[in-house]
Amino acid sequence: MEPVDRMRELLSFIYGPETGRDTHEALHALLDGWRGRLPSPDEEYASGRLPLDHTDAVLITYGDQFGRKGEAPLATLGEFLREYLSGTMKGVHILPFFPYSSDDGFSVMDYRRVNPEWGTWDDVRRISEDFRLMVDLVLNHCSAKSEWFRRFLQGDPEYEDFFITVEPGTDLSGVFRPRALPLVHEFESAKGPVLVWTTFSRDQVDLNYANPRVLLEMIDIFLFYVSQGAQIIRLDAIAYLWKELGTPCIHHPKTHAVVKLFRAICEEVCPWVLIITETNVPHKENISYFGDMDEAHLVYQFALPPLVLDAFLRKDVSYLREWARTIDTYGGKVSYFNFLASHDGIGVLPARGILPDEYIDAMIEAVKDRGGLISYKSTPQGEVPYELNINYLSAISESHLDRPTRARKFLASQAVMLSLVGMPGIYVHSLLGSENWREGVEKTGMNRTINRQKLSYEGVLEELRDPESLRSMVFEGYLDMLAARRKSRAFDPRGMQEVLEAPETVFALLRRSPDATEEVLCLINVSHIEQECVFPSSIFRTAPDAHLFTELTSGDTLVPYREDEDRFSISLGGYEVLWLTPYRDKG
């Protein structure tokens, strides 16, 4: 079915035949207005083809991550990207850079403006000229201090149905709660007190998608971001979009229909743009946003951060390995956004049903011991942990270890993410080897601040120039791994992976390119003890009798020990990472 026809069907499902038809006509006019105004990349992408390859990796950062006197932070960020990451990191996710009132950007006051304290759209476009730009569409809610909400409270008829109100005494007990905060808050309007739906906080008021004008407005903003250079758009908190009393108001069928609508719009007017859904929920629910390959192009691997942390805490990859075996590559039509750290904490919910409760409890205690904090949410059974707030390096590498060991252990954890099928997303504080920022939590009172420190640009550069600093060791090691990853098409997100048997302390994976001509054997030791792995000699399809390997990161030639004609063995040092490909004589 053509995208235009899919749009018509979806809008009829969402709004009913009559309103759906009117909304489709309005959408058709909106899309016509954008045609020819959207800057496509040099390469044209056919609808249905995932425009990613092994060179893709995304830096996750705030727009004001780096401060330098007399310069807009977005301009400083652009300089850092061009000077230090060109040719190594292909994309950048700039977290919300719009005027905001709270939540470090996720309470948007004006969707079409750049925060003037950070820079201008010119700064954003300049970054998009050199890097694949990922932008947030914060579409579940906006700021209670926004012009939209102000006009709603004033009784402006243009905005009277932009937000969701409920009558006092309405039974909301069946609504899924991601936070330990009230679901509704009272505001004073021109008509008197009103109770407004607030999924996340009093300052984040939920938008009413039962009003087609809200949906059309967000589609227009989506395309505006594309016009400014965005090639990946993150649908923030999308799982909670559609509200219907009597349902949990999470993963509603009409929410999925809205995602399908955005996908159809991309295929119609901007097929080079990728949609990624942010749904911090159990794995099975998370991947439901692939739909029938007609929703998100990418979903976050929310289970990965807690599973990798568990593997390093217990020196046992068993649960990580079994979960990785369930990952479907879907023939390369969609893929995963692999990450271990972000501006948020480590989600507990995605690990439920994968890790035993006692291991999750042990992880929570370990996070506390390593200087982290725990955030809770409300359930009918009371408040339960939903997020571990800690810098990932602080979580993985104990502070009493020497710097080289801390760096090596942390980089081994990152190698798991870089090895798995999907596109890597690397949080700036992981790339830079940052640690817990407890002083920030004391300043803001927010647990998440522990991993959101803003940095002096000159101060960071000074540390990176010191080869003995933890920042330098992590940064240089990370760049080496990223450069090595770009050497082999086996790491293509559309490729294949096979999870291998190995000692419980070793995560072993075979990656294969989409055309099956390149392969990499990925080995990561999650313990400090040397380990030996034995594999069949025929493990590489492209070179079944290979007697020599090339290690991609170091470029060294490795000679495995031949156990017999059918098997070889490889030894890994503590926290060692090996990416091995069959040796090919360059002569």
Swiss-Prot record:
It catalyses: (2R)-2-O-(alpha-D-glucopyranosyl)-glycerate + phosphate = (R)-glycerate + alpha-D-glucose 1-phosphate. GO terms for biological process: carbohydrate metabolic process. Keywords: Carbohydrate metabolism, Glycosyltransferase, Transferase. The active site is at residue 236. CDD domains: AmyAc_Sucrose_phosphorylase-like_1. GO terms for molecular function: glycosyltransferase activity. InterPro entries: GGa_phosphorylase (IPR033746), Glyco_hydro_13_cat_dom (IPR006047), Glyco_hydro_b (IPR013780), Glycoside_hydrolase_SF (IPR017853), O16G_dom_2 (IPR045857), Sucrose_GGa_phosphorylase-rel (IPR016377). Its EC number is 2.4.1.352. Catalyzes the reversible phosphorolysis of glucosylglycerate into alpha-D-glucose 1-phosphate (Glc1P) and D-glycerate. May be a regulator of intracellular levels of glucosylglycerate, a compatible solute that primarily protects organisms facing salt stress and very specific nutritional constraints. Cannot catalyze the phosphorolysis of sucrose. Belongs to the glycosyl hydrolase 13 family. Glucosylglycerate phosphorylase subfamily. PANTHER family: SUCROSE PHOSPHORYLASE. This is Glucosylglycerate phosphorylase.
